[in-house]
Regions:
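Residue-level marker of regulatory loop/turn positions in helix-turn-helix DNA-binding domains and
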Residues: 113, 134, 167
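N-terminal helical cap/lid subdomain that shapes the substrate entry/recognition surface
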Residues: 3-34, 38-127
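Asp-based, Mg2+/Mn2+-dependent phosphohydrolase catalytic module
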Residues: 1-28, 118, 122-125, 138-247
Length: 247
């Protein structure tokens, strides 16, 4: 492993320990976001959200989709209503608009896997490190695809979805729930994210949080959200994992 790469990781761990007050980082589990981390689905979600909001007269960009990723659909809709209509959206409006978005998304091609993610998850499994998924999605069909594409690598009962929490990302509740399901302390886990709100949630939960920039955002967007480390792709994450897990 390159010396400067190792030093970067060591420095990030030292900063995390100094900030949190933990004595060590003893990794026993990893919590993955889903869209943009497991599946290359964010371009499809971005297109679906832009089309949906356009139908109801709300200007929305693909960058905004990426910046809002991790937030529940209801929260995303409500925020846009406040910005553009100066009021909260009703539950009925949220359900109707999300139904439109889901309909558009379901007509799109099925997304493939993020390159290299299978190797990352298998490395963890081979080293007896627990794995789970923490997602703002609540669609059962998507969760079923995790089981289909990651055969035996994830336990559905350990997954955290929008249906499990009251406050989604950027609040820490999703990752605190993940820790609870894995029965781990914050310094015994990692969060792997691709979006600012998810990174904020992981950091707020006190977990060492890694950003992998698989989308259209700048690396600085993930750093500004508080990521302890930011990588360009899963290959870099795989290279770093032994240093993080075995340090």
């Amino acid at each position: 492993m390159r010396l400067n790469f190792s030093l970067m990781i060591e420095s990030a761990i030292k900063q995390y320990l100094a900030k949190t007050g933990h004595q060590n980082l003893n990794i026993k589990g990893v919590m993955f976001d889903m869209d943009g981390v497991l599946f290359d689905s964010m371009p499809l979600h971005a297109e679906a959200w832009v089309k949906t909001f356009t139908q109801i007269g709300i200007p929305f960009t693909k960058r905004l989709v990426y910046m809002n990723e991790g937030r529940t659909g209801a929260a995303t809709i409500d925020e846009q209503f406040q910005i553009h209509f100066s009021r909260h959206s009703s539950t009925e409006e949220q359900q109707e608009i999300y139904h439109i978005k889901s309909g558009i998304f379901k007509q799109m091609p099925k997304p493939g896997l993020i390159p290299g993610i299978i190797d990352v998850v298998r490395y963890l499994a081979d080293n007896n490190i627990a794995r789970t998924v923490v997602t703002g999605s609540g669609e059962s069909s998507t969760l079923e695809r995790i089981e289909q594409n990651f055969d035996g690598l994830f336990n559905r009962e350990l997954m955290v979805t929008a249906l499990d929490v009251k406050q989604g990302k950027p609040y820490p509740e999703p990752y605190l729930m993940g820790l609870h399901k894995l029965r781990l302390s914050p310094n015994e886990a990692l969060v792997v994210e691709n979006a600012p709100l998810g990174i904020q949630a992981g950091v707020a939960a006190g977990v060492f949080t890694i950003g992998v920039n698989t989308g259209i955002l700048d690396k600085s967007d993930l750093e500004a959200a508080g990521a302890n480390l930011v990588f360009d792709n899963m290959r870099q994450l795989l290279e770093a994992l032994p240093k993080i897990v075995q340090q």
